[in-house]
Amino acid sequence: MAARLLFRRSSQILRSIQRNPQISSSFESPPCPIFHSLTTASPDPSRLSSLTFLRSLSIARRGPTRPKKIDIGAKARQMQNRRLWTYALTFSCIAGFVVIVLNQFQDQLVFYLTPSDAMEKFAENPTKNKFRLGGLVLEGSVAQPAASQEMEFVITDLITDILVRYKGSLPDLFREGHSVVVEGFIKPYTDEVRKEVSTKPISKKARNLDCFFSATEVLAKHDEKYMPQEVAAAIEKNKKIIEAAATEQAAEVAAS
């Protein structure tokens, strides 16, 4: 402690002497040997070494500065949190993209349905009105209005009949009583369309519906292999239902 105070005092005196050299001449008594050794202008190596020694002694008493400890656990937790947030954001983006793609695909997806199934789905959700209808062309239902380019015919699954209007030429293999697949939209009857339908020889079932099918494409073949399996199975099921009902009715008539 004494050495530090001595060093500070000597430094102050040295600075004051360097600023005003005339101060040294005002002292009547000769300066202290230590001060004389510090204030001399001669660059004596021994005196410089003593000054360096005092300065190093002052620094040594302060003690070495210890470096701050690095918390490895905190850094590891921070990196782990960053990874978790990165994974979460990446997964959210991927999930959102998949949902958007599936919704778009669902909107563009078109199912093969019978007229009965199509009318049931349209009643549940009128906004989803695009279908592929499969069934049989009802005999005697094909007609072309004189003042229109639209062809009209009725598709049936033996339970439900629906009027189809198609603008364009029908395929060469299109025949009454044969299978057909049409793609288009279910639309409600307008007053004009209903007035036209009332004067045409279409089935009573098709006339009693509140909507018709506006076809954008018609596909036809003579064999039943062209018909989708689900539609063919539904028609076969309806045949059995009709046959069973006819047999039951005949039995009731015979019993009476």
Curated annotation (Swiss-Prot):
Transit peptide as recorded in UniProt: 1-57
Alphabetized UniProt keyword annotations: Cytochrome c-type biogenesis, Heme, Iron, Membrane, Metal-binding, Mitochondrion, Mitochondrion inner membrane, Transit peptide, Transmembrane, Transmembrane helix
Stated family: Belongs to the CcmE/CycJ family.
GO biological process: cytochrome complex assembly
Gene that this polypeptide is encoded by: CCME
Protein residues bound to heme: 222, 226
HAMAP family named in the record: CcmE
Protein name: Cytochrome c-type biogenesis protein CcmE homolog, mitochondrial
One GO CC annotation: plasma membrane
Highest taxon in the source lineage: Eukaryota
Effect of residue 222 to A: Abolishes heme binding
TM regions (residue ranges): 84-106
InterPro entries, sorted: CcmE, CcmE-like_sf, NA-bd_OB-fold
A GO MF label: metal ion binding
Function: Heme-binding chaperone that may be involved in cytochrome c maturation in mitochondria.
Membrane topology, as annotated: Single-pass membrane protein
Native organism taxonomy: Eukaryota, Viridiplantae, Streptophyta, Embryophyta, Tracheophyta
Location within or outside the cell: Mitochondrion inner membrane; Mitochondrion intermembrane space
